[in-house]
């Protein structure tokens, strides 16, 4: 059986959201270049995240062609849920970046005049842009209708993000002190009420 993401119409929906996500990442990267004031706390976690995301994406797409990992009769509902999660992840990530405004950078860097941001999706979790990434990649795994792809696309990006979250939180506590500690005490990292 041909998976939905390879069928006319459904393939356009999948690839449109997929490409929009990565175009949004590149646009954001260039749009926020001017936000890089001060010294980065570190740079290695960006390499870890990029490596895990790139590795997960390439492996997930390759594994999708493995017929032994298909979801069977549930492929269309699983595909639709995947598209919804991809779109939700894209929107949440961009919303979080907009909420951070000039404080957003691609590396771990606390701006000299930075304050704790608790508006937008930061009202509910400490790292909503990463929540968006997790939702997007889980969505890709589901939309590919392949269990092996889902596992790789859920685990690898999340592993990179866990490294990044640890590094970011250490830098935020060092720079913002008790303000960030109070904020962190009232919000979970990625998912409200979970973690």
Model regions and ranges:
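Membrane-interface loop-to-helix entry segments
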Residues: 118-134
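Membrane-anchoring alpha-helices and their flanking helix-loop junctions
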Residues: 1-111, 115-118, 136-195
């Amino acid at each position: 059986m041909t998976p939905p993401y390879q069928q006319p119409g459904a393939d356009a929906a999948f690839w449109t959201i997929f490409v929009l996500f990565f175009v949004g990442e590149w646009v954001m990267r260039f749009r926020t270049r001017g936000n890089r004031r001060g010294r980065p706390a570190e740079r290695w976690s960006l390499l870890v995240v990029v490596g895990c995301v790139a590795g997960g994406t390439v492996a997930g797409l390759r594994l999708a062609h493995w017929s032994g990992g298909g979801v069977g009769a549930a492929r269309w509902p699983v595909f639709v849920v995947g598209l919804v999660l991809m779109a939700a992840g894209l929107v949440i990530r961009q919303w979080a970046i907009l909420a951070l405004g000039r404080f957003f950078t691609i590396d771990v860097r606390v701006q000299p005049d930075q304050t704790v941001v608790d508006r937008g999706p930061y009202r509910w979790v400490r790292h909503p842009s990463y929540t968006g990434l997790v939702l997007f990649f889980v969505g890709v795994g589901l939309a590919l209708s392949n269990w092996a792809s889902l596992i790789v696309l859920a685990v690898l990006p999340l592993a990179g993000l866990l490294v990044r979250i640890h590094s970011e939180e250490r830098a935020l506590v060092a720079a913002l002190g008790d303000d960030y500690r109070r904020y962190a005490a009232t919000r979970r990292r990625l998912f409200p009420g979970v973690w």
